[in-house]
């Protein structure tokens, strides 16, 4: 897949050709072959959730149509606000039942990949596992692409006594997962005969 939320907003055709058209070609070839795949694993992304889940003023989980307003951010207000009361809401864990709310073209392509695969699931796959990865890090990552190697970029800047530019109010949070843990989980899903791996899972 092409990856990177910011880049996707202006490299639209690159992301379309790779993430959407590429997936379409795989499905079309499988349909023409007449074969059924025992187990297919799709690498998706936590970005499909957008801002993720929040707790509203009446203590109800909210995830639908959440988006920070540009005018608020210009005033230094980076919270998500309750649509009913206007009060800042608290971020909570985002589970797999959270309503997707893609806020970038990249996220939209990953969600569409999931929909493509699920549409043909009964016809093509005996078992379909979709992993929605958090930020994956590990040895060998690119030091030039901040979308794939943020920790490596920060480490190298700190090692060179350079400033780490963190925007907003410094209270941002990110969930990271090491590539070894990703590989271990994928291997577990591959070598397990358990049908519980037939579904969609957050990983990170």
Which ranges hold each PLM region?
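N-terminal Rossmann-like NAD(P)+-binding domain of SDR-like oxidoreductases, especially those catalyzing
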Residues: 1-134
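Short, flexible active-site loop motifs that bind/organize anionic cofactors or intermediates
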Residues: 5, 13, 172, 203-204
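A general structural signal marking secondary-structure boundaries and capping sites
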Residues: 7, 30, 34, 52, ...
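Short, electropositive, low-hydrophobicity segments enriched in small/polar residues
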Residues: 10, 26, 54, 111, ...
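Short beta-strand segments
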Residues: 41-44, 130-138, 168, 200-204
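Glycine-rich "substrate-gating" loop/helix at the edge of Rossmann-like oxidoreductase active sites
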Residues: 103-106, 134-148, 168-180, 194
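Alpha-helical substrate-binding/gating segment
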Residues: 122, 136, 152-165, 174-201
